């Protein structure tokens, strides 16, 4: 196996010393990059881009050619699992993802097949192994999945939603049906992520994008408990190294204490949670990742530098020198000038040396 040349991302997640703060960006391979748009155009559509190993590898590597990033993340979509379960994923321009079928009854849940990730999602595993090989040990590769709760919202609603009407209706009127669906999805995610690890993923992130739509008790019952089940079922070591796991619940900064119980090595934060407060709350028990508002990248070079330095000051305010990975608080948007993320990345590396040097 190729020796990893830059492992500071993995070391930071495990709260080990690093020489400078590692950084990657959620959605770092995306529409803001002209080379991504060109590759997507060649692929024809988004799903074809995800399912073509060569294209998926190319777009994964594109941001690493522009920026001094400390990790690559598999280019794929969180909805690959529901698609493999037979719901029929498709995308409508301007409307986001949709499914031909929904899951709204006990019978719908019972009809879902058992996922065999290595067979049903072989294109994802081919992409992971191809990207890992193409990286040549430059930086670690992150694999990922959506959380059961987040996947369930798309499956029950039939696509994106702001109110989650049908999912919350199920949660309060037929909680046993929702639990059956979430349990099925947790098993599917375990199989999916373990297959990614076998294929070469060196760290895992669970995207709980819609966990923040829940009240506290419901968050624990319908989201957090299933992420805990997943983490307990994951292969945690490969090639002599621990496979760190990051849990990111958007809008979940108030739940850091219960999130620690999931067994995750690190917790992702969005921009609404002050890093210094979060550091005090977790008290060195887990690493933290985040949390620049992606909209900061619309600003001038000076304003980006100022915001990044303030974020780092918060991250290291309590004197801790380990357990922090810089990132955005959510995915980078398509309207960002590709020159701006370089300011973010370079400022993180240069300014953090003040604390870590």
Swiss-Prot record:
It catalyses: uroporphyrinogen III + 4 H(+) = coproporphyrinogen III + 4 CO2. It is an enzyme of class 4 (lyase). One of its GO terms (biological process) is protoporphyrinogen IX biosynthetic process from glutamate. InterPro entries: UROD/MetE-like_sf (IPR038071), Uroporphyrinogen_deCO2ase_HemE (IPR006361), Uroporphyrinogen_deCOase (IPR000257). Substrate binds at residues 27-31, 77, 154, 209, 330. Pathway: Porphyrin-containing compound metabolism; protoporphyrin-IX biosynthesis; coproporphyrinogen-III from 5-aminolevulinate: step 4/4. One of its GO terms (cellular component) is cytosol. GO terms for molecular function: uroporphyrinogen decarboxylase activity. The keyword Cytoplasm applies. Homodimer. Catalyzes the decarboxylation of four acetate groups of uroporphyrinogen-III to yield coproporphyrinogen-III. This is Uroporphyrinogen decarboxylase. It comes from Acinetobacter baumannii (strain AYE).
């Amino acid at each position: 196996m190729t020796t990893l040349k830059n492992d500071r991302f993995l070391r930071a997640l495990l709260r080990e010393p690093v020489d400078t703060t590692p950084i990657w960006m959620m959605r770092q391979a995306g529409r803001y990059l002209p080379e991504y748009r060109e590759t997507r155009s060649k692929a024809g559509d988004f799903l074809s881009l995800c399912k073509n190993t060569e294209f998926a590898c190319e777009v994964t590597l594109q941001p690493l050619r522009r920026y001094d990033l400390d990790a690559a993340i598999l280019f794929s979509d969180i909805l690959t699992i529901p698609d493999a379960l037979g719901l029929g994923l498709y995308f409508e321009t301007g409307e986001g993802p949709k499914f031909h079928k929904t899951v709204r009854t006990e019978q719908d849940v019972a009809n879902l097949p058992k996922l065999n990730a290595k067979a049903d999602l072989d294109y994802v595993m081919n992409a992971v192994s191809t990207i890992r090989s193409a990286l040549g040990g430059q930086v670690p590769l992150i694999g990922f999945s959506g959380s059961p709760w987040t996947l369930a919202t798309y499956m029950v609603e039939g696509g994106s939603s702001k109110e989650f009407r049908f999912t919350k209706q199920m949660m309060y009127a037929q909680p046993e049906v929702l639990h059956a669906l979430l349990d099925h999805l947790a098993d599917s995610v375990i199989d999916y992520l373990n297959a990614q690890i076998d294929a070469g993923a060196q760290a895992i992130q669970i995207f709980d994008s819609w966990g923040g739509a829940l009240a506290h008790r419901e968050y624990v019952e319908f989201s957090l408990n299933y992420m805990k089940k997943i983490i307990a079922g994951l292969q945690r070591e490969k090639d002599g190294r621990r496979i760190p796991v990051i849990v990111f619940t958007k809008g979940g900064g108030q739940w850091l204490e219960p999130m620690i119980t999931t067994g995750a090595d690190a917790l992702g934060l969005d921009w609404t949670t002050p890093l210094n407060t979060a550091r005090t709350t977790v008290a060195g028990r887990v690493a933290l990742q985040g949390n620049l508002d992606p909209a900061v990248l619309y600003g001038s070079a000076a304003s980006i530098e100022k915001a990044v330095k303030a974020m780092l000051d918060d991250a290291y305010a309590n004197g801790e020198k380990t357990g922090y990975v810089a990132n955005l608080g959510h995915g980078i948007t398509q309207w960002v000038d590709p020159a701006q993320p370089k300011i973010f990345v370079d400022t993180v590396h240069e300014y953090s040396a003040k604390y870590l040097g």
